[in-house]
Amino acid sequence: MTYYQRDLPHWHPEGKALFVTWRLNGSLPSGFRPLPGERSTGKAFLQMDRELDNGTIGPVWLRNPRIAQRVVDALLYGERELKLYELLAFVVMSNHVHVLLQPQVPLPKITRVLKGFTAREANQILGRTGKAFWKDESYDHWVRDDDELHRIIHYIERNPVAAGLVQRVEDWPWSSAREP
């Protein structure tokens, strides 16, 4: 098992699927912290995800269809061409991305490739230079068993419905629920 820590702890057991969330820089209040006692639980993630789904703080550049599609294209390219992972589920929301993948290389390499490419593409579309697009650290969780895997796929693909953006999962254009 690989372990490292920055602001968040990261455990990556070999052969396990990973649920990864990355968000736009500035998409949570600067003082945002999980409630005491919840940092190492799923409750902390849900608290963060609710804040992100509200989309009331910071940039929402992923609402731009060109940028959202670039992120989807990069995710698919990372799987099909670069062979970095097997992509199990994904959704691009207005200010964050959820991805469930089976890594073929270390997760830091995957996030560096995906976030680096999509940041350059998005900043070009937005006419921005020299500013961070993504928050530098990502949230990740290793999947314990098949039941959890299916719950996470359901969670990811229902995220646009839960956020009130669409009525049906297949109506959200930037999701694995739409992919053939």
Language model: regions and residue ranges:
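Short catalytic/metal-binding and nucleic-acid-binding patches
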Residues: 1-180
